[in-house]
């Protein structure tokens, strides 16, 4: 049974003309799969490899190089929150904010809240020092005003 839907396979194929080789589509393919499945299962690695005419080891090497991909043993929650831990964010309370958010969700960075709604991750720098401390939720940067605000935005209530 196929892990990848036909629509995601088609989205991957649509990238072939945009890149100089099929191998160059590895990273976008991994992103597409994780976005849809909230992880990159072993079966998906094999299917991506087949589509890109690579070995599964080549796809896995790319996946394991980047810390933001998850396998099926540790899938993402419905919303992924990156809290910046750069110096400007830490100087403006980022450490305390991170500790309070993790304490209230009963998780450590990299973990999912019990309801699998939220995954908290650490980001080295989000390039938004003027908003320090800040966070990235999916693809959008937000000021991380306080723990209540972080949790509201993370849970889609703001």
Residues covered by each model-derived region:
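Signature of N-terminal electron-transfer/Fe-S-associated modules in redox systems
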Residues: 1-158
């Amino acid at each position: 049974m196929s892990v990848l839907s036909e629509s995601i396979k088609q989205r991957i194929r649509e990238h072939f003309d945009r890149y100089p080789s099929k191998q160059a589509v590895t990273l976008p393919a991994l992103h597409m799969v994780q976005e849809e499945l909230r992880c990159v299962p072993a079966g998906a690695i094999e299917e991506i490899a087949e589509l890109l005419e690579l070995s599964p080891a080549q796809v896995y090497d790319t996946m394991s190089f980047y810390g933001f991909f998850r396998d099926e043993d540790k899938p993402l929650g419905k919303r992924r929150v990156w809290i910046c831990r750069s110096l400007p964010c830490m100087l403006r309370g980022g450490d305390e904010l991170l500790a309070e958010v993790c304490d209230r969700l009963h998780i450590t960075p990299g973990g999912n809240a019990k309801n699998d709604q939220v995954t908290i991750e650490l980001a080295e720098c989000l390039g938004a020092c003027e908003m320090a401390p800040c966070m990235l939720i999916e693809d959008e940067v937000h000021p991380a005003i306080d723990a209540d605000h972080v949790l509201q935005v993370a849970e889609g209530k703001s």
